[in-house]
Amino acid sequence: ASDVYKRQSMYQEALSRQLALDYCCSPADVADSKNHFTIYVPQEGRRRFQEQTVCRLKIAVVNGKLLVTGSEEIVAECRKRYADVTGEWFFDMKRLRELEELLAPFGLRIAQVHPFFLPESGGIASSDLPSALLSDARDFELIRYDQDAILQFRGDDRFDQAFAFDPDAPDVLGMAAVKDGEILGMAGASADSPLFWQIGINVTLHAREMHVGSTLVRLLAQDILAQGTIPYYGTSMSHIASQRVAHRAGFAVAWAELITEEVR
């Protein structure tokens, strides 16, 4: 139990460190229960996946509260309106409509709202793999790809979730499940920051009942942890199958995030 607790506090501590860099606050600000509003200044070590050139507003809900960062005038408006609002229902439609109204005069709108997952305290150790996954794993061969080998998949839309080919967040690890020469599934990790590497996964339609996705995500997470970095996983609010993959692979929801974009 003490090992589980140690692992859980390691993940929580890492999340506080990472979100502090992403939201221009301190790790203590992330860990407490108060809302924090900061002016965005790019920090060394921030996550850079699909990074916008200018961040005018983004909001994280973590530990039941809000982290808000962006340009001074928009953050000031958010502070006025949301200083004492809790995080639990913040991404419900009523609030999102209200936020869009606040953003409209600034020429902004909501772009995405996503949940993000971290390894659960139970860990991602191979000894934790359910026997069903281990027997399934024997049904296919595992192939690992390093950063250079991943380049062969550029432009291959079968693996659009596994590899993003984002120059700011390079794809650094890949793992495929192969049977009879066919790739059944591919998991990839992008180095979104020095501390946090994001896992993406593609699985062929006919392999979805074989636990290929959760096996690959769990094994890739082990490889990432072995490098001294933290694996994380993001998906859509309504992508239940993807959330189930994360859960079966030993991940649990840790925070949710909203980003904005210019109205074109």
What are these regions (language model features)?
Residues 13-151:
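Acyl-donor-binding surface of acyltransferase catalytic domains
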Residues 1-5:
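Short, small-residue-biased leader/transition segments that mark boundaries at the very start
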Residues 110-119, 252-264:
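Conserved catalytic-core motifs of GNAT/GCN5-like acyltransferases
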